[in-house]
Regions:
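Boundary at the C-terminal end of the N-terminal hydrophobic targeting segment
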Residues: 9-15, 19
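Beta-propeller domains
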Residues: 47-71
Length: 738
């Protein structure tokens, strides 16, 4: 049945009682439907749904009928699902093994195999533009000719024909008008600012339009032209703290005097919708603690007002028909899974479609509180607190859950991690520490060069607040996070170990220098921003000082690390090197690697496996409740490289030495086998290595092994010799410490 009334009623009747453990499979299994959109003519729905446990593309008639899977990928989930304007095809993206080299695919809704529109090895591609006037074409950005820069291509979705629009010779991005003319481009200058240039239609002459200083770049940007090409819309914090919606006249000198469309003194303008015919803004969203809609076009006022009453939670308009009369509206609740509605603008009535996780309807889910947490220097951190259902919220074990980025933010709404941890008996606090985005330039810039410093102080202040409020038991606090949040975990356990009972690091970097030195090539044009906001490789002492690996000897609390072997952002060597350093010092660590994952765990069986390990880990060190591990770990690809004292029944430890993922035999090379030029290179490399902390050498060895795999035969002897020297240094260090 199309509408899941029976399913919802059954779930509600069988609701999980307060105190019962909600199974991980229910909390972290695939949603039945997500990423819902409506076809241009309003007759069909598209959504992501599982096929044998992997998220694929589906379609279903709006008026009911059987849903049909259009793809059958078994290795990785699809993402970015959307309709082509021709109404006959769906577009989506997919990578391989978590490498984040996403390709653009198309599939016909009538059936047939999906086709890769960007079938190039090692290339990253994404859709930049679509158009009602060109329904069979899209504009794609792709680093096919230079891995650092994205060139622009026009691709026919029916034939697959590619036409180069603009070869990128060093720009961070482009702006196209409605006719797909390249009208704007941007490049970073020596000061870390962004120089925006424009050109007029039919002209090859570029002129400087607006230079955005480095301290404004997180809050000021150009988005795109209106359909007429007379206004260039964007966000600007120039002359103010919070980013406002503005437009510039696209002409010489026009960058100096933007027109403000809407601004708020609470937070940045962070979202909204535009007219699909004119590309003029119709409404904007400002999100401080909760999203607030502000109508710009009075024609939308009745819709927005009615949608605010249609269902619980905060809504967003996720898809619209070509005539803009029918919308797909998603509601985000804190104590229930998201719900999708069909909104008829003519009748001003909504029709419930489905919920993303029907099994969670009626479950005893917790509410999320929006709170302001003070910092020691007088700032306020918009934060989100969840406590167990039925709990008084006092003297609880607590998980400080740190978001990644760090130039991102946490928001109010349904969060499976908050629900899971609260269901196991923990309070969960997610602070938006300085450096988080969305709260104005002063707040984000306060995090500049404060990794391991004031950004970490903010996390400690969050702990202090929770203890002072009587929420958290000071002896039972864990710190957990992914990406930058994982870095914050390592920083917390090395800088302030007395605050935390344990830590969970998910794909977090352990050394800022090795992180910067191994970023994907398409990040390199932006590295000046990293220099200004984090630190420069030209100041190695500072980089060492803000790197947890440097301070590894201070870890005296249990640590769990999860890592994807194919992570292109935070390489596996980041986790390998801190695990090696801890092992050398006899410090306990639980280390889990997933060979088929990247920056995060997207395969549900892998995600559930790692969460099962987290659950046992937290129960052991904080005393919360835990669902038995069962077969969750053995059903995944998890490699338990170090159990760290955990007794994971049925799971075998997979031991990997020296950070190698696969054993590789290396031939022994003597120095006299190398040419004079190669011997000189060895001297230079070894001189550099002599200046590095010994803890970093396993990571360097990993990188040399990766280079060896790609190097031509004539370079093998040189690389083998250097690896041999590294092995000797690592072995000598181990013997000395022993």
């Amino acid at each position: 049945m199309f509408f899941e009334v029976i399913c919802l009623a059954t779930a509600a009747a069988q609701g999980v009682a307060v105190g019962d453990l909600i199974p991980r499979e229910v909390l972290f299994g695939n949603p039945e439907r997500s990423s819902v959109s409506i076809s241009p003519d309003g007759t069909m729905l598209a959504f992501r749904g599982p096929v044998d446990g992997v998220m694929n593309a589906w379609v279903q008639p709006v008026e009911g009928g059987e849903a049909k899977a259009l793809t059958n990928f078994s290795d990785r989930p699809i993402g970015g699902l959307s309709w082509s304007w021709n109404g006959d095809q769906l577009l989506f993206s997919k990578d391989a093994g978590g490498d984040e080299n996403f390709h653009v695919y198309v599939v016909d809704i009538a059936g047939g195999e999906p086709r890769d529109l960007t079938p190039h090895d090692g290339v990253r591609a994404g859709i930049s533009e679509t158009s009602q006037e060109r329904p069979d074409e899209i504009v794609v950005s792709m680093n096919k000719t230079n891995p650092q820069f994205m060139s622009m291509y026009r691709i026919n979705t029916r034939t697959g024909e590619q036409t180069l629009i603009e070869e990128n010779e060093g720009y961070l991005g482009y702006i196209l008008d409605d006719d797909w003319n390249i009208r704007g481009r941007a490049a970073m200058n020596e000061d870390g600012g962004l120089v925006n240039e424009l050109r007029d239609v039919g002209s090859d002459e570029w002129y400087e339009f607006l230079t955005i200083p480095s301290d404004e770049m997180m809050n000021t940007s150009m988005a795109g032209f209106n359909k007429a090409g007379t206004r260039l819309y964007g966000a600007s914090s120039l002359g103010r703290d919070k980013a406002a919606l503005v437009w510039w006249a696209p002409k010489k000198g026009g960058g100096e005097s933007p027109t403000v469309v809407f601004e708020s003194d609470k937070a940045d303008v962070s979202g909204g919708i535009g007219n699909p015919d004119t590309y003029e803004p119709e409404a904007v969203v400002v999100d401080y603690l909760r999203p607030e809609w502000h109508v710009l076009d009075s024609a939308l006022a009745p819709d927005i007002e009615a949608l605010q009453k249609l269902d619980q939670g905060d809504f967003n308009i996720s898809s619209r028909t070509k005539d803009n009369r029918t919308w797909i509206v998603a509601y985000n609740r804190d104590n229930g899974p998201p719900r999708y509605w069909l909104w008829d603008r003519d009748t001003q009535k909504g029709r419930f479609l489905f919920t993303t996780w029907p099994a969670l309807e009626g479950a005893a889910l917790a509410s999320m509180r929006s709170v302001e947490v003070p910092t020691r220097d007088g700032m306020k951190m918009p934060s989100y607190l969840t406590v167990p259902v039925g709990s008084a919220g006092k003297n609880l074990p607590m998980v400080l859950f740190v978001h990644g980025g760090p130039w991102a933010r946490d928001s109010w709404g349904y969060n499976p991690y908050h629900q899971w941890l609260a269901n196991r008996g923990y309070a969960v606090l997610s602070p938006n520490f300085r450096g988080s985005t969305g709260f104005g330039k002063e707040f984000v810039n306060a995090g500049n060069r404060e990794w391991y410093g004031k950004m970490q102080d903010d996390l400690n202040d969050s702990v202090a607040w929770a203890v002072e409020q009587g929420i958290a038991d000071p002896k039972r606090i864990a710190i957990m996070g992914g990406s930058y949040g994982g870095y914050a975990v390592l920083a917390g356990l090395t800088r302030d170990p007395e605050l935390f009972a344990c830590g969970v690091d998910i794909v977090g970097p352990s050394h800022v220098g090795t992180l910067i030195g191994s970023v994907p090539p398409y990040w390199k044009p932006m590295m000046k921003m990293f220099d200004d906001r984090v630190g420069s490789m030209d100041e190695p002492a500072y980089i060492d000082a803000i790197s947890p690996l440097t301070h590894v000897k201070y870890i005296n609390k249990p640590l769990l690390i999860g890592q994807g072997a194919n992570d292109p952002r935070v390489k596996i060597s980041e986790s390998n090197q801190i695990v090696a350093a801890m092992n050398k010092r006899g410090l306990p660590v639980t280390y889990v690697v997933f060979p088929d994952e990247g920056h995060g765990f997207h395969n549900p069986t892998n995600n559930m496996a790692f969460n099962a390990i987290i659950e046992e880990f937290l129960a052991a060190h904080l005393g919360g409740k835990a669902e038995p591990v069962g077969d969750d770990v053995t059903n995944s690809t998890a490699q338990l490289r170090d159990k760290g004292g955990l007794s994971l029944a049925g799971a075998k430890t997979h031991v990997v030495t020296k950070g190698e993922d696969e054993p590789v035999e290396l031939s022994v090379v003597a120095i006299d086998e190398l040419s004079p030029e190669e011997q000189q290179q060895v001297q230079m490399v070894m001189a550099q290595l002599s200046q590095m902390p010994i803890e970093q050498l396993p990571m360097v060895r990993d990188q040399m092994m990766q280079q060896r795999a790609m190097a031509p035969p004539e370079s093998q002897k040189l690389i083998n010799y250097i690896i041999g020297q590294l092995d000797d240094k690592i072995e000598q260090s181990t013997k000395q410490d022993g």
